[in-house]
């Protein structure tokens, strides 16, 4: 028998049941089945992290969504009432279905008396008044629905669905509370897989990948916003399918299903291995294969006269611009260092690019159109292509004028 000064030992065990693998708490000699418990690894680290901004990242099936929901729920029933409330976003409304299903599975089991309202908004309301709204945020224009709100808990599910960080950063201005008890809890949380339209900006923001063998990534304390203000600290936390005992007990072959569903090598490596070093975020991800589409460089002066060379232009001034040079094969082959190019008429090669940026994300060179034009001609002369390059497509913004009459 323990003495009064000896703390009661509490342990967690997982046992098979008709409902699947379920958690059991052993408090001293008393065992009690519980509705939900954080699993070892990413889930526990995520729920214990007190930084104002945290990303749960990992491969498919790693239990990130459950952790996101419980991150909000763990502060319900603590006496804050309606002051503690949150907003969980998916990119589109249909994508909310999976979140709704998971909340309907867990919340009524854990919180007796909780109510779900499915009207103009999808809202879970706790008996003490706390509430979580499920919504979608497709475009920056949707921010007008939330501008001026105080929302102490904000979640983004599948963050790489957003092509850039605009929507994510807009909501940071709403992550606050006038109640000092709740203000100290205010936080922004997100989940993500590698791959998707937003792969690159999410990778940059959270400095992914996390070093192998680590669960918690670098705590980022040296990041500044566009105005030069120091941002709040943030980090990423790694989740892995191998940690999800519940899913693997119910579906031991789940990983094989993920492998079979992947449409290309990049998607496969992202979903199976959580590989952030893949090429992702573009229109052609589903068909892009580096072994096929990347070839060794060749001297541009060796391009046969029968090939057609032109250039494309994606305009930017305060934002980056891109000039692309293309060579289309006539069917006459080009042979260089044992490699044969252009054997098929119509083969298209991106032979060069001038990307006009400062080296800072999304920051252009602020060059006027005439300076860009001179830069194009200078480069063509350096490459030995003067007089060979035909004009090609350019986006319509080249005709826009600012107040001074200059192209913007």
Task: Write out the residue ranges for each language-model feature.
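Pre-P-loop entry segment of helicase/translocase ATPase cores
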Residues: 1-53
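Walker A/P-loop NTP-binding motif
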Residues: 65-81
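Conserved RecA-like ASCE P-loop NTPase motor core of nucleic-acid helicases/translocases
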Residues: 84-95
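Inter-Walker segment of RecA-like/P-loop motor cores
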Residues: 95-152
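Walker B catalytic acidic pair
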Residues: 157-159
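ASCE P-loop NTPase helicase motor core
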Residues: 161-246
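ATPase catalytic-site recognition across NTP-hydrolyzing enzymes
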Residues: 243-315
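Mg2+-dependent endonuclease catalytic cores in nucleic-acid-processing enzymes, primarily RNase H-like
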Residues: 335-408
């Amino acid at each position: 028998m323990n003495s009064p000064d000896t703390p009661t030992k509490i342990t967690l065990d997982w046992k098979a049941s008709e409902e699947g693998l379920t958690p059991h708490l052993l408090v001293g000699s008393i065992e009690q089945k519980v509705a939900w418990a954080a699993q070892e690894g990413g889930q526990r680290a995520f729920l214990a992290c007190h930084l104002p901004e945290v990303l749960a990242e990992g491969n498919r099936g790693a239990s990130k969504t459950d952790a996101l929901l419980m991150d909000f729920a763990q502060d319900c029933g603590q006496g804050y009432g309606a002051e503690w409330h949150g907003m969980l976003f998916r990119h589109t409304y249909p994508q909310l279905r999976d979140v709704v299903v998971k909340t309907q599975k867990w919340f009524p089991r854990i919180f007796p008396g909780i109510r779900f309202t499915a009207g103009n908004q999808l809202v879970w309301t706790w008996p003490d008044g706390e509430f979580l709204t499920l919504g979608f945020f497709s475009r920056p224009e949707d921010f007008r629905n939330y501008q001026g709100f105080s929302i102490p808990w904000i979640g983004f599910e599948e963050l790489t669905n957003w092509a850039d960080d605009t929507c994510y950063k807009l909501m940071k201005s709403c992550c606050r509370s006038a109640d000092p008890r709740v203000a100290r809890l205010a936080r922004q949380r997100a989940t993500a897989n590698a791959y998707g339209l937003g792969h690159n900006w999410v990778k940059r923001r959270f400095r992914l990948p996390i070093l192998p063998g680590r669960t918690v990534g670098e705590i980022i304390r040296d990041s500044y916003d566009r105005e030069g203000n120091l941002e709040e600290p943030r980090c990423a936390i790694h989740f892995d399918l191998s940690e999800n005992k519940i899913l693997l007990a119910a579906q031991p072959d789940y990983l094989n299903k993920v492998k079979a569903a992947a449409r290309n090598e990049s998607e496969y490596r992202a979903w199976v291995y959580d590989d952030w070093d893949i090429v992702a975020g573009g229109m052609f991800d589903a068909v892009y294969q580096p072994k096929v589409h990347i070839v060794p460089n060749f001297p541009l002066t060796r391009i046969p006269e029968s090939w057609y060379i032109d250039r494309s232009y994606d305009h930017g001034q305060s934002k980056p611009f891109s000039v692309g040079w293309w060579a289309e094969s006539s069917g006459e082959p080009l042979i260089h260092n044992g490699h044969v190019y252009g054997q098929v008429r119509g083969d298209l090669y991106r032979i060069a690019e001038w990307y006009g940026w400062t080296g800072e994300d999304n920051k252009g060179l602020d060059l006027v159109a005439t300076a860009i034009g001179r830069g194009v001609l200078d480069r063509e002369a350096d490459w030995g292509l003067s007089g060979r390059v035909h004009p090609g497509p350019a986006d319509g913004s080249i005709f826009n004028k600012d107040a001074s009459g200059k192209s913007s």
